[in-house]
């Protein structure tokens, strides 16, 4: 159960980082 929650957090964290990178790239343009 703990591992499942950690995996979910890691997945959403990497998704958030990807979104942030795309936002930064758009802002830089």
Swiss-Prot record:
The keyword Cell cycle does not apply. Residues 8-29 have a biased composition (Basic and acidic residues). Keywords: Ribonucleoprotein, Ribosomal protein, RNA-binding, rRNA-binding. GO terms for cellular component: ribonucleoprotein complex; ribosome. Disulfide bonds: none annotated. Residues 1-29 are annotated as: Disordered. It comes from the Archaea. One of its GO terms (molecular function) is rRNA binding. The keyword Transmembrane does not apply. Part of the 30S ribosomal subunit. One of the primary rRNA binding proteins, it binds directly to 16S rRNA where it nucleates assembly of the head domain of the 30S subunit. Is located at the subunit interface close to the decoding center. Belongs to the universal ribosomal protein uS7 family. This is Small ribosomal subunit protein uS7. It comes from Methanosarcina thermophila. The gene is rps7.
